[in-house]
Regions:
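Acidic/polar, glycine-rich intrinsically disordered N-terminal extensions of enzymes
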Residues: 1-135
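Catalytic alpha/beta active-site cores
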Residues: 73-250, 254-259, 263
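Glycine-rich phosphate/pyrophosphate-binding loops
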Residues: 151, 250, 283-293, 329-334, ...
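Acidic, His- and aromatic-enriched active-site or binding-groove loops in soluble protein domains
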Residues: 175-182, 267-278, 315, 355
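Short glycine/threonine-rich loop-to-helix capping motif typified by GTGT followed
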Residues: 261-265, 301-311, 341-351
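Phosphate/pyrophosphate-binding betaalpha-module
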Residues: 275-331
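C-terminal catalytic subdomain
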Residues: 340-373
């Protein structure tokens, strides 16, 4: 297994970069990274992963996984896991409607993405929260298209006027019309994936053109603890068969859906990501994967995740190190805050975690524009 070397950190788009290669941050030693890796392999071998998808469960069984059909659990051997890691693509480029606008993964670039959409919106006039609207989405798409350092544009709003049953398809259409950059929208159902891929085929110029120049990656979120969801697997299958990359990122939550220690959370998070990698490579060997290291801690007062905690930043740095151990480009949840409005708290929490993630060498930083959880 080829460990990914720490690359020079650059800001901005190709041709306009700011080098920060002389500064780096880490929180784990090499032996600690290996300990987490070994613990994840034990989890997958002994506890296994629950797979809510009959076809995928059978596919894993055919590949040598031990299947507990009564409980829909697949137990994965070290060989199956590491062979899948070796097969996975680890560098790729997403292209915008204007192919000069690119988001490059695995090249050491600093990729920022505006949020694919939230249900609530902080009104700029009242500073109060309200339901997001279609006008908010249009404004956010225009803003993301105009901001030089945003590489991937999201709608930032889930407008209440658009029925949820086809909202992701509708917003995909608005994105490809409203920006010439790569874009992303949230997908929740396999049927929506069919329509979204058809939109991008039309923009790219057909099936072959989209394969040659990918324009969209899907995001699969394993459900902690240790589950792969049916809808997510339906979507992944359609995307990898269309030759598009996949980002795999569970939101394991310390003391909630993951162990009460950060190390335990990292081991579980890593196991869930590796299980997703195995599935992508069984479906389409060579599929490019981004390692979505996005664990959080639970605020025991509210029982929801904390976006602005110190632990959030520490685990983000650790996840970069673990992703580099396997050679994957890495996406982390930093640049977030627990503040409910854009204020000093928001600036401090966002800035601190974003800086640490950047200095650790992450590839992508998502959900720019979010306040609160």
């Amino acid at each position: 297994m080829a460990k990914r070397q720490k690359q020079e950190l650059v800001f901005g788009h190709p041709g306009r970069k700011f080098n920060m290669a002389k500064i780096s941050v880490s929180v784990l030693s090499d032996s600690e990274v290996n300990d987490i890796h070994e613990a994840s392999l034990v989890i997958l071998r002994d506890t296994g992963i629950m797979v809510h998808h009959g076809e995928t469960l059978r596919l894993l069984g055919q590949a040598g996984a031990k299947i507990d059909e009564g409980n829909n659990i697949a137990r994965l051997s070290e060989k199956l896991v590491m062979d899948s890691v070796a097969k996975a693509g680890k560098k790729y480029i997403l292209y915008g409607r204007n192919p000069e606008h690119q988001a490059r993964f695995g090249y050491g670039d600093f990729v920022l993405m505006s949020s694919p959409g939230q249900y609530m919106w902080v009104d700029s006039k009242t500073n109060k929260r309200r339901a997001a609207t279609l006008q908010d989405a249009h404004d956010a798409i225009r803003l993301g298209d105009a901001l030089e350092n945003i590489s991937i544009v999201g709608s930032m709003a889930q407008p209440e006027e658009i029925p949820e049953s086809y909202r992701s398809v509708f917003l995909t259409g608005e994105l490809v019309k409203g920006t010439t950059k790569p874009s992303r929208s949230w997908l929740y159902r396999g049927q929506a994936a069919d329509y979204v891929l058809e939109i991008y085929r039309a923009v790219a110029g057909g099936e072959a053109a989209l394969r040659e120049h990918p324009m969209i990656e899907t995001f699969m979120e394993p459900i902690s603890p240790l589950q792969l969801p049916k809808d997510g697997l339906d979507i992944v299958k359609k995307f990898v068969q269309a030759g598009q990359p996949v980002s795999i990122g569970p939101m394991a939550m310390t003391t909630g859906t993951a162990p009460g220690t950060l190390a335990g959370t990292l081991a579980q998070e890593n196991a869930e990501i590796l299980a997703g990698v195995v599935v992508t490579q069984l479906l389409a060997p060579g599929t490019a994967v981004t390692y979505g290291g996005i664990p959080h801690i639970m605020d025991p007062r509210t029982a929801i995740c904390s976006f602005g905690s110190p632990e959030q930043a520490l685990m983000g740095v650790a996840m970069v190190q673990i992703a580099c151990f396997y050679g994957f480009p890495v996406y982390i949840n930093v640049g977030l805050t627990d503040a409910k409005v854009p204020d000093a708290q928001a600036g401090i929490e966002k800035g601190t975690s974003m800086l640490l993630g950047a200095l650790a060498g992450a590839d992508m930083f998502g959900h720019c524009g979010i306040c609160g959880t």
